[in-house]
C-alpha cells in the first residue's frame, strides 16, 4: 500500500525518506531519520518500533544490513513487514516479507533503498531508483522528483491519499538548533505527491539558503527602492515586513545585505501597491 525511498547525500550531510501511500497520514508511520546517523522506512503491516529502534542501532554503529537483520529476525510477523534502511556511511538494505501483497519488492544501491508493496508493478520501484540517480539537486529535490516519477508510473494500485518528505541534517533545523531540515506531510489529498511538491516549494522559499556571496549590498539606488517599497505597504523596515512574511531565516544578520530571493518577493508584493 506504500512506496518509499530512503536515501542520503553524504557530502551535504543529509539523510531522508520520501513516501506515498493509499493510507492516511503516512508521514506519521513510515519515515524515520537522524542527521549523520541514517534513515529508516517501515511499511506494509508496519512495525512502528522498527523506526526508533533502527535509528538507535544505526547510531550505535550498526550497518544497514545488520539493522535489517536485527529488526526482522526476532519479529514473528516479519513476513508481513517491509523495511528500507540507509546507514551513516551510505550503506543500504531493503527487506520485503514473503506475505507482503503483490506487487512488492525493493532495490538498493549506494546511498539509497527503494521499496514498495501493493504496487501496480516493479516499474514503480524502478522509477524511484532511476529518477533519483538521474536527477541533480539537493537530496530533497532528488527524492521528490523520484517520488513523482514513481507516482506517475502507477504507484499504489489502490489509489492515492498521503505523502511525506523527511530530511535530517545536523544543525539544519529552524534556527540551527536541531536536525529537522524538512518534515513535510500531506495527510489526506486526492493527489498528494504533487501537493507535497507544492508545499516543499513554499518551505524552500521561506527557509532555503542562498549562498552568502550572492547577497546584494543595501545601498544607493537599491536602498532607496527598498525604503520606498516598504513604505508603500506600511512597513518602516525590512525586518518588520520579513517577520510578518516568515522570511526571518533569509535575512542578513548585519542588516547590510539582502537575499535576492527576499528582494524578488518584496518587488512582487509591492508591484501593484
Where are these predicted regions, by residue range?
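A short amphipathic alpha-helical interaction element
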Residues: 214-253, 265-270
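DNA-contacting surface of Y-family translesion DNA polymerases
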Residues: 261
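N-terminal nucleophile
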Residues: 1-220
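Short, surface-exposed glycine/acidic/tryptophan-bearing loops
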Residues: 255-257
Amino acid at each position: 500500500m506504500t512506496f518509499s525511498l530512503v536515501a542520503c547525500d553524504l557530502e551535504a550531510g543529509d539523510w531522508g525518506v520520501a513516501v506515498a501511500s493509499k493510507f492516511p497520514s503516512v508521514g506519521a508511520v513510515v519515515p524515520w531519520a537522524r542527521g549523520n546517523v541514517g534513515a529508516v522506512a517501515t511499511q506494509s503491516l508496519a512495525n512502528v518500533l522498527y523506526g526508533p529502534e533502527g535509528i538507535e542501532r544505526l547510531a550505535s554503529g550498526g550497518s544497514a544490513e545488520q539493522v535489517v537483520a536485527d529488526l526482522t529476525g526476532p519479529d514473528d510477523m516479519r513476513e508481513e513487514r517491509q523495511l528500507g534502511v540507509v546507514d551513516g556511511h551510505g550503506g543500504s538494505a531493503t527487506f520485503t516479507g514473503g506475505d507482503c501483497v503483490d506487487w512488492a519488492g525493493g532495490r538498493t544501491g549506494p546511498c539509497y533503498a527503494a521499496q514498495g508493496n501493493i504496487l501496480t508493478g516493479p516499474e514503480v520501484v524502478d522509477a524511484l531508483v532511476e529518477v533519483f540517480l538521474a536527477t541533480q539537486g539537493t537530496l530533497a529535490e532528488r527524492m521528490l522528483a523520484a517520488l513523482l516519477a514513481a507516482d506517475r508510473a502507477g504507484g499504489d494500485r489502490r489509489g492515492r491519499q498521503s505523502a511525506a518528505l523527511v530530511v535530517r541534517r545536523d544543525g539544519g533545523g529552524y534556527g540551527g538548533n536541531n536536525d529537522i531540515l524538512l518534515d513535510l506531510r500531506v495527510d489526506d489529498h486526492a493527489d498528494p505527491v504533487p501537493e507535497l511538491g507544492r508545499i516543499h516549494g513554499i518551505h524552500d522559499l521561506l527557509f532555503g539558503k542562498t549562498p552568502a556571496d550572492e547577497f546584494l549590498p543595501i545601498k544607493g539606488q537599491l536602498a532607496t527602492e527598498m525604503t520606498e517599497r516598504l513604505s508603500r505597504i506600511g512597513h518602516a523596515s525590512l525586518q518588520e515586513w520579513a517577520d510578518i512574511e516568515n522570511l526571518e531565516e533569509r535575512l542578513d544578520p548585519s542588516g547590510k545585505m539582502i537575499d535576492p530571493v527576499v528582494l524578488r518577493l518584496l518587488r512582487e508584493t509591492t508591484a501593484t501597491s
